[in-house]
């Protein structure tokens, strides 16, 4: 019997068949943005529905030299109580499913927790190189298996330097991400439709969209024109 995910309208909880794996390697996701000045309005909208938790992290985007490239995100809590933590989230992001009928992005996603005092050396040993890094500060809201994360993005003017004089805000808007994680062989369409329904409740404050970001990320550079 195939693994099946049933997402109910009330609690949005997964009901998995007996032989399903608890390890979640699929992700349905939507993206949006909201002006920072309007974030309190979004939080008030979410307050009656969601349980919140603080999130403040530094993220590094890496890729391999393989074709197609392997994309990894390294994330850790940043300067918690004046200490930099050595626990990292290592997140692999695959190429999204080419399903035009699905109302959300569906992609392979594998997350692991790693403890390392020199994570970048480990990443380099995997054949990864850093594309860019940024610092996020925001809140994570959850209800059942739905997660909403809103965060502001900050970059450092000098790599490896994170004092206040070296940090610069990237935008006057906050990034909003809403997602559901699923087992690998689960049918994703019911969860995707449920996620779309919840996302519509956030309008008109924020319009959550199925962004075709991968068309740029995974595109092959065009060969230079001959003269």
Swiss-Prot record:
Keywords: Activator, Nucleus, Transcription, Transcription regulation
Main location, first listed in the record: nucleus
A Pfam family that the UniProt record links to this protein: Med18
Entry's localization field: Nucleus
Entry's Gene Ontology cellular component terms: core mediator complex; mediator complex
Subunit structure of this chain's protein: Component of the Mediator complex.
Record PANTHER family: MEDIATOR OF RNA POLYMERASE II TRANSCRIPTION SUBUNIT 18, MEDIATOR OF RNA POLYMERASE II TRANSCRIPTION, SUBUNIT 18
The family this protein is said to belong to: Belongs to the Mediator complex subunit 18 family.
Name by which UniProt lists this protein: Mediator of RNA polymerase II transcription subunit 18
Name of the coding gene: mdt-18
